[in-house]
Design a protein with these regions (language model features):
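Anionic-ligand anchoring segments at beta-strand to alpha-helix junctions in alpha/beta enzyme folds, i.e.
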Residues: 14-15, 23-99, 213-257
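Glycine-rich, acidic loop regions that bind phosphate or pyrophosphate groups
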Residues: 66-179, 370, 374
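Short glycine-rich anion-binding loops that position phosphate/pyrophosphate groups of nucleotides
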Residues: 38-40, 65-67, 104-107, 225-227, ...
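Short internal beta-strands
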Residues: 58-64, 125-128, 306-312
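A short, gly/pro- and small-residue-rich
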Residues: 51-56, 111-131, 240-241, 394-410
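Conformationally flexible catalytic loops at phosphate/diphosphate-handling active centers
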Residues: 1-28, 189
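Active-site diphosphate/adenylate-binding microenvironment
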Residues: 179-273
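Thiamine diphosphate
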Residues: 83, 95, 134-137, 144-146, ...
């Protein structure tokens, strides 16, 4: 098969000159950051990415669809960048003087609506398999690399092996690594305030308590709304885990079919490799699960080991927040607080399908309830009743100005907004030579 004869685009191979230029730019940088996108997974380049990241020795941020590329405890992992990212990841990007992005198209979700302010002090090296993505007006790309991510990373690894001794890293800037590590420690997504209210439970507290109890290598599939956003914000990622979402499409109802697909694929993989099969975790919401509710019977019929954690926030919480932020009362088409629609009682639906059922209605009950659900042999539904007033945070947001106008704040300035002096202190790194 010859793609050129079919008039198909042939992706160019990465040249030695390109690789050497990238290495030299990283070597010269004072505040480099590696932005790791989901194209790395798609290219089958996960293993080589991990080796290259270790050899480069620069802080790593992940994107909206790629949070499982690096575990939270990895020394180089800084955070999650973008308008649904965290503070530490965005502080690193916004203070960087070089951004090396691999396998990410750097969509508006990654660069924000105030895209001229994105990584404005950085020399941007961007890799993507689609040449058109490198030309978008919402980006400044000083060194475009049109290539397959695996080809780029394999050639980088080969060149780094030639240039570096065993155990040596390319970037020698310990101070910058320590600064990024401190941001990660000082600005966690899940905070003590999320545990203060006892009942109902807080969704951020739930996400942390659930995810920290999972095993290395375990697979989580999430629905949309709170499951995707809060999960993407606050999930504790461990080594070898997968976090699967359809965030770019964001259609409700993805959760159950995707969890079934992940379960079947995982069974086949474990059979072929001899690895121990683990339960699949499905985190979804009271709105999303209704879109493909019939798949509960598929799970029961085949006794697929899927643990369903159902976030009950009384309706469509993403829409609730949008209406409250921009329009106010009365709310329309939300759930309990709009009064014009409602959802069935899962305590009655679950046994009708044959599921064991657990309900958690307070922060104090999170640990016991989650552990009970995880310990049950086979499928289970664990419903978590959460606060309807909890907003997604931190999050890119419009900022009110003194004249009453609204402007999109840059990525370093996520809502809830930090005190001005604190933010200035954090951003001082961007002006250092």
């Amino acid at each position: 098969f010859d793609p050129s004869k079919e008039n198909l685009t042939v992706i160019p191979s990465v040249t030695n000159e390109q690789v050497d230029a990238i290495i030299e730019k990283i070597r010269q940088a004072k505040r480099p950051v590696l932005n790791a996108g989901n194209g790395i997974r798609i290219a089958g380049a996960f293993d080589v990415f991990r080796r290259v990241a270790d050899k480069l020795g620069i802080p790593v941020v992940t994107g909206w669809n790629s949070i499982d590329l690096m575990e939270d405890e990895h020394l180089l992992y800084t955070g999650r960048a973008g308008n649904m990212g965290d503070r530490a990841g965005n502080f690193a990007v916004q203070n960087s003087d070089l951004l090396f992005s691999v396998g990410s198209r750097l969509s508006i979700r990654q660069v924000n609506y105030d895209w001229p302010a994105w990584a404005k002090h950085a020399f941007v090296i961007m890799n993507d398999i689609d040449a058109e993505e490198l030309k978008k007006p919402s980006l400044h790309v000083e060194m475009p690399v049109w290539a397959d991510a695996k080809d780029l990373l394999e050639k980088l690894e080969s060149r780094l092996n030639e240039k570096l001794a065993d155990g040596e890293v390319l970037f020698k800037g310990d101070e910058w690594r320590q600064v990024c590590e401190k941001w990660k420690k000082d600005y966690p997504v899940v905070q003590p305030k999320h545990y203060e209210q006892k009942s109902p439970a807080n969704v951020y507290a739930f996400i942390k308590e659930e995810s920290r109890r999972l095993n290395e290598g375990q697979i989580t599939v999430v629905g949309n709304g709170s499951a995707c956003v809060v999960g993407g914000h606050g999930y504790v990622i461990k080594k070898g885990q997968r976090f699967i979402s359809n965030s770019a499409i964001a259609s409700m109802g993805y959760d159950l079919p995707a969890a079934i697909g992940a379960c079947v694929a995982n069974k086949r993989y474990c059979k072929e490799t001899g690895e121990k099969e683990q339960d699949i975790i499905c985190v979804t919401g009271d709105g999303s699960i209704q879109m493909n509710l019939q798949e509960l019977q598929t799970i029961i019929h085949h006794q697929y080991p899927i643990k369903i954690f159902l976030i009950n926030n009384g309706g469509y919480h993403s829409i609730r927040q949008t209406q409250n932020n921009y329009f106010g009362k009365p709310l329309i088409g939300i759930g309990k607080d709009s009064g014009d629609l409602s959802f069935p009682d899962m305590a009655k639906l679950a046994p009708a399908y044959g599921f064991p059922f657990i309900r958690i209605d307070s922060n104090d009950a999170l640990g016991e309830g989650i552990e009970k659900a995880l310990s049950i042999n086979g499928p289970v539904i664990c419903e978590v009743m959460v606060d309807m007033d909890q907003k997604f945070e931190p999050k890119a947001a419009s900022k009110p100005m003194p004249d009453g106008s609204m402007v999109s704040a840059p990525l370093e300035d996520l809502a809830p907004f930090l005190p001005e002096e604190e933010l200035k202190s954090i951003m001082r790194w961007s002006s250092e030579e």
